[in-house]
A protein has these predicted regions:
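Extracytoplasmic soluble-region selector
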Residues: 364-449
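Long, hydrophobic alpha/beta structural blocks
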Residues: 127, 135, 148, 192-219, ...
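Hydrophobic, Leu/Ile/Phe/Ala-enriched alpha-helical segments that form helix-helix packing faces
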Residues: 68, 169, 173, 215-218, ...
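Short glycine-rich, low-complexity/disordered patches
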Residues: 32-33, 76-84, 178, 189-190, ...
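Extended, compositionally biased alpha-helical segments that mediate assembly or anchoring
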Residues: 2-66, 273-365
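Extended oligomerization regions of viral-like shell subunits
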Residues: 209-321
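Long, contiguous amphipathic alpha-helices that act as assembly "spine/axial" helices in icosahedral shell
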Residues: 125-197, 337-343
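Assembly/oligomerization interface modules of large self-assembling protein complexes
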Residues: 57-141
């Protein structure tokens, strides 16, 4: 079960911060450091006491970053523009299992059949997707002793110090989270794993009609708008439109509200802005995914194509994002008279194969060809072989295929895994047919030996 931390507010008064630290400090700290009054002289007096004793410095700075800084980080973390897509903190484990149960099958009423099938089991069609923790990073910043000394010279100096420390770390974390979310969308778009619909961005009325139709379509049960191909729907209140700033500037709130059959106030709560689906910080992403063999760096042309996408309509549950760990640590370097502060961040980034999503594309999506790799293979009876379908597309057309075999003893799964029966012989043509354009297909010829 995931939980979202409560947003807590913190006054920017140094006196309040100092007293909050004192309230949870050790007995030794409280014996030396009195309660602070909200005036500059009192704060300077406390500063002199703390700066005179290294042990008090360490306890003060540790509490400042770990306790007070955590309040600031937590409150800001759940105020970012894409916060509605985050699930919260993952309380247990590092893996999330997402389960989808298909609709029950209908049966014809027949008392005669009932006599024979009363105790027959009907196993439900259950599909699962596993999402694993895949983001473990830390961020680091340094506080010099002089920074600590200066914090006690003004009424808001202590608060400014903790803000200075945490803002660097938080900004990095928030920016990276946003970049990864955009990268996930880009990867699913370029792989053809999001349903697409052509939209005329040069005509606002036409665009509004197309978006309204898409929103209405999601209200009905369908298997066309999610990666797993399960039959599901998305309620209006669970629909969110991610819209780039350029397209948003051409659309009035009234038009969009009409498109999604919402009041203008309701629409604002379901509209998420993005600077551009191709506005990826390639250098930063390269650092984040360094050493990851699955990371793909987009070319300039690919990023420009992504930036042409005006909007994507997603189910509230499309993104599967959990925080697992968000922890501060600090360490004093007595030789250098400074403290290093570390923010460790563990997250789970994924998307749901069962949640609906529709991308609005300014061009016409097409499938130009399908090839199967390998194109030919010799397989012994009783063995298996995994085939790969490569689907060439334009304008982010879906790349999913349907596998089929012309030999009943040589079967192929939906994932392209070929199984050769021990009694099979001869050849089998394994075909991969594009679901988006059934006129496009590729074939592998299997020879059984």
């Amino acid at each position: 079960m995931a939980t979202k931390p409560k947003v807590r507010t913190l006054t920017n008064s140094s006196a309040d911060v100092l007293n909050a630290i004192r309230n949870s400090a050790s007995v030794n700290y409280r014996n030396y450091v009195p309660v602070v009054t909200p005036d500059a002289d009192s704060i300077r007096e406390i500063g002199a006491i703390i700066m005179d004793m290294p042990a008090l410095q360490n306890e003060f700075l540790s509490a400042l970053v770990n306790r007070i800084g955590k309040v600031i980080i937590t409150s800001k973390s759940y105020s970012n523009p894409w916060a509605m897509f985050k699930k919260g903190f993952l309380d247990f484990g590092e893996t999330v299992e997402e389960v989808f149960v298909a609709m029950a099958k209908p049966f014809q009423y027949d008392p005669a059949v009932a006599e024979k099938e009363l105790f027959k089991r009907e196993i439900p069609d259950v599909q699962s997707a596993f999402h694993v923790m895949n983001f473990q990073k830390f961020y680091k910043t340094t506080t010099e002793e002089q920074d600590l000394r200066l914090a006690f010279l003004s009424e808001d100096g202590v608060y400014n110090l903790v803000s200075k420390i945490t803002e660097q770390l938080y900004t990095a974390m928030e920016n990276d989270e946003f970049q990864v979310m955009k990268y996930m969308l880009a990867r699913n778009l370029s792989r053809g794993q999001i349903s697409v619909q052509t939209i005329n961005t040069s005509n606002i009325d036409d665009a509004t009609v197309a978006m309204r139709k898409a929103s209405n379509d999601l209200l009905f049960m369908s298997n066309e708008y999610n990666l797993a191909g399960v039959t599901t729907h998305t309620l209006r209140d669970d629909q969110y439109i991610i819209i780039n700033t350029a397209f948003d500037a051409t659309q009035s709130v009234k038009n969009l509200a009409r498109a999604f059959n919402m009041s203008e106030a309701e629409l604002l709560g379901h509209t998420v802005l993005v600077d551009g689906f191709g506005k990826l910080d390639v250098k930063r992403l390269g650092e984040l995914f360094e050493g990851d063999p699955n990371y793909y760096e987009y070319s300039k042309d690919e990023l420009e194509a992504l930036n042409e996408i005006p909007a994507i309509l997603v189910d509230r549950d499309y993104f599967v994002i959990y925080d697992k760990l968000q922890q501060f640590r600090d360490l004093e370097n007595v030789q250098g008279l400074y403290w290093n502060h570390y923010l460790h961040v563990w997250k789970l980034f994924s998307v749901s194969p069962f949640a609906n999503a529709i991308a609005f594309i300014p061009g016409t999506p097409t499938v130009t060809g399908v090839t199967v790799s390998p194109g030919e293979a010799t397989v012994s009876a009783g063995q298996v072989l995994t085939l790969t379908a490569n689907v060439a597309t334009t304008n982010f057309a879906p790349q999913s295929v349907t596998w089929s075999s012309d030999n009943p003893l040589v079967t192929v799964s939906a994932a392209g895994v070929v199984k050769v029966d021990p009694t099979a012989s001869g050849t089998a043509n394994i075909k991969a047919t594009s679901k988006f354009d059934t006129t496009k297909s590729g074939t592998c010829v299997i020879t059984v030996q």
